[in-house]
A protein has these predicted regions:
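Conserved N-terminal subdomain of the carbohydrate kinase-like
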Residues: 49-134, 311-323
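Anion (oxyanion) recognition and catalysis
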Residues: 44, 70, 148, 152-156, ...
Length: 323
């Protein structure tokens, strides 16, 4: 079985070859997309095994995704196929400010119809880390219940649960519902990994240390806060209860497209945990993967191999950071 497991909605990504508008595009090269899919690709590229849990439609998009996963070695044994619901896809066009324009075609998708019984036949043998996000949780009440059940089952098997909230407010009936649901999942997690603004939203607090205390007091073991392009900070409690923190700056790069940076960061955290890196080197690797990813227009094609990551860390200058 794989070392890592994730659950989410993989999509086909059609990228316009123009820089500002779909109308100017002459071709739409297809690649892969979806936050959890990006993480799976990142973990795979760094030399670790990962299994994907989802539902795909019996259509060309589903065939493409399954073929891609099988081709690079992502375990697909926990993927269902279904008739009557499409596999999601998206259209993306680059923007000069690094924030691309994206149109989603995912309403009523097969993934959104995933139900908790998909967990029944999952074998957790060998799985060390479960990665979940707030995106798949937000699709429907069933997907939220599926994620919750998967987390609960994983914990029964002593699997470390890493939760990236990755909020999508438009998928929730209200902000209050999103905050409540997110914090319930955070309380079940071992590693909670929000961006600073996300942590502020979900905790109602402003300062990173206060946000960390809020989640450490819930029982979260590690709180990792992403500080945008500046870097990141990790908080945890020592055996005596004292809060410990590690702050690591990011790298100097030219930004092409910011999509996938957080997913790349997550893949770096996951592989670092698998390899037993200390907190400083964990954040260094995670920052590096995120920095490399923003230099590529694709959501995942820029994600590095372990060798590429090592060279980037060795030769790329750092920024300065302070809390």
């Amino acid at each position: 079985m794989s070392e890592v497991m994730t659950i989410g909605e993989p999509m086909v990504n059609l990228i316009a070859d123009s820089s500002e508008t779909y109308l100017e595009a002459r071709t739409l090269p297809r690649q892969m997309a979806g936050a959890e899919f990006n993480v799976a690709i990142g973990v795979n590229r760094q030399g670790h095994s990962i299994s994907y849990v989802t539902t795909l439609g019996n259509d060309w998009q589903g065939d493409l995704i399954l073929d891609y996963m099988n081709g690079i070695g992502i375990d697909t044994s926990n993927i269902r196929r279904m008739d009557g619901a499409p596999t999601g896809y998206q259209l993306k066009v680059r923007s000069s400010d690094g924030e691309p324009k994206v149109i989603y075609f995912r309403t009523g998708s097969a993934a959104s119809q995933t139900t908790p019984d998909i967990v029944d036949n999952i074998d957790f043998t060998g799985v060390q880390i479960l990665h979940v996000t707030g995106i798949f949780s937000a699709l429907t009440p069933n997907t939220y219940d599926t994620v919750t059940r998967l987390v609960q089952e994983a914990k029964k098997h002593d699997v470390t649960v890493l939760f990236d909230p990755n909020p999508r407010p438009t998928l929730w009936p209200s902000q209050e519902a999103m905050i409540d649901a997110t914090n319930k999942l955070a309380a079940l997690s071992d590693v909670f990994m929000p961006g600073l603004e996300e942590g502020q939203l979900f905790s109602g607090l402003r300062e990173p240390r206060d946000i960390a205390n809020y989640y450490l007091n819930m029982g979260v073991k590690k709180v990792i806060i992403k500080l945008g392009d500046a870097g990141s900070v990790l908080f945890e409690r020592a055996e005596n209860g004292e809060r410990m923190e590690t702050v690591v700056p990011s790298f100097m790069v030219s930004v092409v497209d910011t999509v996938g940076a957080g997913d790349g960061f997550a893949s770096g955290v996951i592989t670092s945990l698998l390899e037993g890196l200390d907190n400083e080197h964990l954040l260094e690797r995670a920052n590096a993967v995120g920095a490399i990813q923003v230099t590529s227009v694709s959501d995942s094609e820029g994600l590095p191999t372990a060798e590429e990551l090592e060279k980037f860390i060795a030769f790329t200058p750092r920024k300065e950071i302070s809390l």
